[in-house]
Amino acid sequence: MTHFVAIFFSSLFMCSNVFAGSVSSVSLGSLSSALNERMQVMKAVAGYKALHHLPIEDLPREQVVLDHMLQNAQQAGLEPHSVEPFVHALMNASKTIQYRYRADWLSSPDSAVPVRDLTETRQQIQQLDTQLLTAISQRLMTGAFSQEDKEFLMSHLTAPHLSESDKNSLFASLSRIQRQH
């Protein structure tokens, strides 16, 4: 009888490890996809701001984004205070990408500047932010972010104008996010 109990528990342990690994890989894929898409949307934001002669940095809007993400973080089961540095890193990378696009357009004035309605673009960004927080929460259910996770994300974050230092800043703040207790 003890032999069967040992087999049962070892099978249960193996299944939980397989499940945890699959959740981890799925959530990392979702995380990298949402991050890439969010960074790619910055081209449209930069285009709108360039066309309407708006500054890239918009501190009141950043506060709205921060408040919204912290509220969503709590709903996703994350500790909001631990998410705040990630949100700042995300917004800084987003602004940096916008500046890089604006610089490209200044040096190549004939290039087409994409223009979309900013309200629609912001709705898309909010949806992506929710996806990001959900993927982070799911990943943290299996444990903290690892070096392998960093390598995966660094190799899969391929959005134009996202530099290695941007990626490092994002991952450093991402690795400090915690689930609520």
From Swiss-Prot:
Which residues make up the binding site for substrate?
R38, K49, D58, E62, Q98
Q: Which residues form a coiled coil?
A: none
Taxonomically, the superkingdom here is Bacteria
Q: Which GO terms describe its cellular component?
A: periplasmic space
Cite the entry's keywords alphabetically: Amino-acid biosynthesis, Aromatic amino acid biosynthesis, Isomerase, Periplasm, Phenylalanine biosynthesis, Signal
Q: Where is each Chorismate mutase domain found?
A: 21-102
Q: EC number(s)?
A: 5.4.99.5
Instruction: Return the protein name.
Output: Monofunctional chorismate mutase
Organism, by scientific name, is Enterobacter agglomerans (Erwinia herbicola)
